[in-house]
């Protein structure tokens, strides 16, 4: 990345990582649970076995990211625009819709 850092297999729970660019990076096994990711750029990134559960995603960008193997936690409909064009799995789609009160059959 711009900082020349690698975060693979890293525990970054509750870390303050505002406005860092992870654009086009492949992040593997990174736990961002509860992290402050305000303004971070994950566009076109691949998140494999990563967790975003409970992270602050205000102004974060995920357009065209591959999130199929990431734990997204409970996303809100208001967050949906941040994920435009991102790839998610059928399971994740069902979880998102279920969180909105819809029954996925």
Question: What residue spans do the PLM features occupy?
Answer:
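Tandem repeat scaffolds
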Residues: 1-105
